[in-house]
């Protein structure tokens, strides 16, 4: 019924582990196969693609449902329906942040200290351009295909980059001066597919499985042998 697309790359392992724990395990012929199957009648197709591409493909109707980051929904501006957050990222349950960072020796303490014409290296050119325009700063936004932190100071004056803990930026001698966006992993749907009652119902069931699995990670299963005579006295003492 549902054509599903999952993220490849940094979110891939955590996403596949979540689906496995939710009894929605993805079977593939190899770890580099971009196609998979889920033994569930609600899922007819599984593809694994870069998260940057997923919002546009879902909006276009190539897939009914996708897992990507809020950062890429904002960057692409794709008109998708958000079904909600899945609170995990590459290494932790914390969100990632899209931040503005400068070299440790930069005189800029905040974004408004950056000069007009500031050179910005980023993998998020649209999001970055909108952000600086909103601050009234004319920015020379330069698309980066990675390792943005290595481009300060000779190629760029600052970067807009993604970070989960900030450690990599600090290790590169950079300092964060603002956060543009806090981004969780998100489930997005095609608008027409979501308008179909049967598909929307199936989407809701899958979301319940995934969010329930995440919530259960913070829970502990406690089993007790209690006599019927003591049941009413013991029950209020059990945390739930």
Regions found by a protein language model. Give the residues of each.
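Domain-level signature for soluble enzymes in the chorismate/prephenate branch of the shikimate pathway
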Residues: 1-240
């Amino acid at each position: 019924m549902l054509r599903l697309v999952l993220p490849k790359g940094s979110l891939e392992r955590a996403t596949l582990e979540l689906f496995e724990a939710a009894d929605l395990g993805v079977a593939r012929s190899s770890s580099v196969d971009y196609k998979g199957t889920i033994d569930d009648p609600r899922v007819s197709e599984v593809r694994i693609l870069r998260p940057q591409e997923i919002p546009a493909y879902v909006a276009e109707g190539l897939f009914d449902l996708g897992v990507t980051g809020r950062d890429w929904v904002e960057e692409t501006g794709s008109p998708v329906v958000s079904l909600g957050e899945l609170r995990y990222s590459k290494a932790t349950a914390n969100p990632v942040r899209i931040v503005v960072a400068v070299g440790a020796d930069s005189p800029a303490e905040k974004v408004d200290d950056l000069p007009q014409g500031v050179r910005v290296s980023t993998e998020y050119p649209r999001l970055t351009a909108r952000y600086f325009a909103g601050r009234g700063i004319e920015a020379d936004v330069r698309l980066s295909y990675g390792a943005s932190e290595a481009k300060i100071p000779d190629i760029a004056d600052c970067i807009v980059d993604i970070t989960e803990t900030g450690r990599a930026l600090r290790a590169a001698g950079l300092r964060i001066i603002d956060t543009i966006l806090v981004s969780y992993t998100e489930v997005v749907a095609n608008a027409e597919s979501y308008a179909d009652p049967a598909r929307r119902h199936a989407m809701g069931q899958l979301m319940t499985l995934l969010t329930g699995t995440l919530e259960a990670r913070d829970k502990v299963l406690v089993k007790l042998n209690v006599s019927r005579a003591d049941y009413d006295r013991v029950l209020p003492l059990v945390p739930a």
